[in-house]
Amino acid sequence: MKKHTKFSALMFFALFFGVASMSYGQAGLTPDTEVETDKRAQTGMKFLSTSVDARAAAIGSAMTAELTGTSTSMFYNPASMGFMPGRIHAGATVMSFIADFAYTQASVAFRPGSGKNYGVVGVSLVSVDYGEFNHTIRANNEQGFIENGTYSPTAMSIGLGYARSFGDRFSTGANIKMVFQDLGSGFATSLDTDGGIATTEDYSISTIALDFGIVYATGFESLVIGMSARNFAGEQTYVRERFELPLTFQIGVAMDLVDLTTINPDMHSIQLHVDAQRPRDFAEHVRFGLEYTLMNMVSLRGGFEQLGVSEEQGFSAGAGLRYELGGFRIGADYAYTDFGVFGAVSRIGLQVGL
């Protein structure tokens, strides 16, 4: 046990400092030369940084230090999947985002072998339908443009994840994903009333991105520390415009506050989740969430995804149900997030485990 503990601690600190260095490097900064800037609109494929899962969204998406994860952990910290209870888990969530952007998320994870720790393997999918838009072309007329039908942008990410626990306190995991985005086709030159279309361009692109992370149970009550880095990828180009993916580095803690009281832990649970997030294209901020669970069946949740940042996104809240039936663990989740002048966003999720 001591050997496992020493190994876990060494791995934790090695990965922490390694990823911190790489995060600075991909941003073109070093800890000694960083200049304070207002980081906005510096990345593409932003759908990769949108939190879709209903349970996660309800607690402010502070999921980095989740110890006993599920297949949905691949979207936050793949290492949490290493302690997945049972052998199989599947989950799906739908979300109608701002401007009626339709998100669909699905994941499946399974533990191969029987009685041996071969880790956990998972497959994940995120699909986005941005709806239908009018296609216009600049022209020398009174309006300055003419309409040329419609187009429907889409985006998708398909991932393959793996996680493995070492002992009962440490787990590491990674997720490799193919990312696609199709913004339709467009005309590369303006339309002149006396001329015509010179060329067209196809604005679709694909690339490979990598996520990885670790979780570590400290041994102090149920306190867990986690770290993840998401969306590592090379620079992308649309015709002439270059952009990066939304690289994000996170470190978080989680704990059941009931451990600090005399309350019966079999009846009640109050999970505290806190993440510190450093995105490539947004200000550093804190994510915060609380989840109260009664008898491992009914959960009430609340949180902030951008605590301390002046943005339209506000408080999130939600609820969940868990029930065992014939050996299956069945669950349903709902989340509500206030986006100020943009209205509210709802998420509905279902899951099943065996």
What does each of the following model-derived ranges do?
Residues 26-354:
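Subset of outer-membrane beta-barrel
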Residues 1-43:
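Cleavable N-terminal export/targeting peptides
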